[in-house]
């Protein structure tokens, strides 16, 4: 006979999603290409709006000298990009805002054609347009002859871009140094004046970033490994854009126990868990289309055909990729007043609500949640990656994380299988549940499956999404790149497997992650994808799950060892914070409010580790150490003191220590006297009922359970235990009526596995012809429950 107890949910955190993006690095042109227009290079103009006008609109003759303005504007672009900071990081930050400022006064506010706008926004949204190690490209000055020619003729002309400078420090080119190229350019510009007026002007700048389109694939450096196409599970290829899109926000996810608990609250939806990485426009390595703003829309699993997968990267850390060629961005010629460098920066931030404060808030939240202390070997690898300039850091394949699905079979539906066996095909056809193919192939569908308790279908969908990330079946042991997106998917899949009791499958798929300390599981390993971000990409709850899994496989000592390692790191981080340092022990300049938030977070995480250790000790039947561990947890969760003391008392009841259990129950009454509310009174009455159960006084226990039901008629624990008391009092019929009435009253809430197990046991005690009643329960389960229901409680097999 199974007696339901109060379930306690344990807190856990999930790491956020983050930004990533591929990068293309420009290459210097040869001498022969200097005087030819780059028709096959796509270029981006930092100030595209100042040079844009309606198509085929001629330039007015009263405008300023075009050559001077173009030259001055391009030189300012070089000055901006050649700042001491990494240009790649700067461009990534500006691109995330995706705001285009108003042109200076006196300039015509014309926009580029829609296709050009999309290409510019997509490319600026890419987090790594250029590499700080590469030499910036410059535009040579034009001769006075060519300026005169441009001033006389007001039609649109082709302007050729000059080769990149060999020295990055050289920002200005003197007239003597570029005399020969200018003469060649002058003759060519003069000859081009007789061309058609409809020829567009390719706008030149220092960046050469190709837009990922189906007809323009990226060319990656050949690394000897199979490249996989990655389609983002979080964003669609919708081409619509908006004028403004809020900056991407990274928010921590709530506890999985909220959604995987035995009793699900109506206001605890699975959508809450995934909001942190489905409602923000994050930029991912496997998601180069994230830059295209898709406001208030969640995407399907689609991506341009020409995209390359992060799986094509080699096991060694490499930053070089070949530059792809594409069509030149075309826009009509306009000659506004040339803006100053600071005007350009202000134009980018125009219309945003304090973007610097937003970025600071995001970084503080990331720092708190992502902080972790790597091992010495991992720290050395990350330092070599951070300090490398022009070389490549090579890492052994054994030190990388290369996961893949170990099984790809469909999980199926055990409830429907039982219906086919006992009720026939006609009855089984009436069962309609969601599966992995009937929902959107994205996080939206994953949330829907979890909220409907179709966890087996959710496992299948996680496998499909991981396959889209290049980590599917058969990919185990192959090089891959990780994102917070993919690691969240792994965590959800593994948590679902553990919840379904598929411990062996979870262990096999956890194996490639090792001890979760490989260097490619840290943000520092991807400086061009996550510029400036530090910490671990692994969710903290995934570390807890990794440690707890072994106790379900019969290795509780291994679980304790892993939990002790996690506890050591949490204690060290908490000690650093309490000493006024950063999480990693370095100097910190955060505000007092932010420091208090970090201390609170890591105290909560340390308490969560101790809670898992206490559960493991309880499983090992080391009750003395388990009680001590639970008492220690109270220091970190003082608001849960009544629940923890009640749990300790019930543990003592199970081992027969009635007096000590009564002492702890009295302590609960003292604590709850300070609290007002119904829950405190119910907790005290429940403890008294269990105390009488431990003394085999079922009549008194039934009285207290009945009193609880008068105060809270929906209390399933009290209802189930009251029926059990009636059974032990010899009142089988009354016990059956109470359980049946409870199930019929609210099937969705009371079709609990423990309740149904007790009910089927009573059916067997009542009559040898209990199969028909069990089949009736199966029909009720089929109409309400998802595919995660444990059919063993029905005792039909």
Curated annotation (Swiss-Prot):
GO terms for biological process, alphabetical: COPII vesicle coating; endoplasmic reticulum to Golgi vesicle-mediated transport; Golgi organization; metaphase chromosome alignment; positive regulation of protein localization to kinetochore; regulation of kinetochore assembly; vesicle tethering
What are the record keywords, sorted? ER-Golgi transport, Nucleus, Phosphoprotein, Repeat, TPR repeat, Transport
Phosphoserine (modified residue): where? 125, 128, 234, 309, 314
UniProt lists compositionally biased (Polar residues) regions at 206-216
Q: Where is the composition biased (Low complexity)?
A: 9-23, 232-244
Record keywords: Nucleus included?
A: yes
Where are the TPR-type repeats located?
607-640, 642-675, 682-715, 716-749
Biased composition of type Basic and acidic residues is found at 29-43, 66-75, 107-121, 173-185
The UniProt entry's GO CC annotations, sorted and at most eight, read:
cytoplasm; endoplasmic reticulum-Golgi intermediate compartment; kinetochore; nucleoplasm; nucleus; perinuclear region of cytoplasm; TRAPPIII protein complex
Q: Which residues carry this modification: Phosphothreonine?
A: 130
Cite the InterPro entries for this sequence: TPR-like_helical_dom_sf (IPR011990), TPR_rpt (IPR019734)
- List where in the cell it is found: Endoplasmic reticulum-Golgi intermediate compartment; Nucleus
SMART domains xrefs = TPR (SM00028)
In this chain, composition skew of type Acidic residues spans 47-58
Q: Which domain of life does this protein belong to?
A: Eukaryota
Q: Where is this region: Disordered?
A: 1-257, 286-338
Its PTM note reads: Phosphorylated as the cells enter mitosis but is dephosphorylated at or before the onset of anaphase. The phosphorylated form recruits CENPE to kinetochores more efficiently than the non-phosphorylated form.
Please explain the role this protein plays, according to its UniProt record: Component of the TRAPP complex, which is involved in endoplasmic reticulum to Golgi apparatus trafficking at a very early stage. Also plays a role in chromosome congression, kinetochore assembly and stability and controls the recruitment of CENPE to the kinetochores.
Q: Could you describe the subunit structure of this protein?
A: Component of the multisubunit TRAPP (transport protein particle) complex, which includes at least TRAPPC2, TRAPPC2L, TRAPPC3, TRAPPC3L, TRAPPC4, TRAPPC5, TRAPPC8, TRAPPC9, TRAPPC10, TRAPPC11 and TRAPPC12. Interacts with CENPE.
What name has this protein been given in UniProt? Trafficking protein particle complex subunit 12
Record gene name: Trappc12
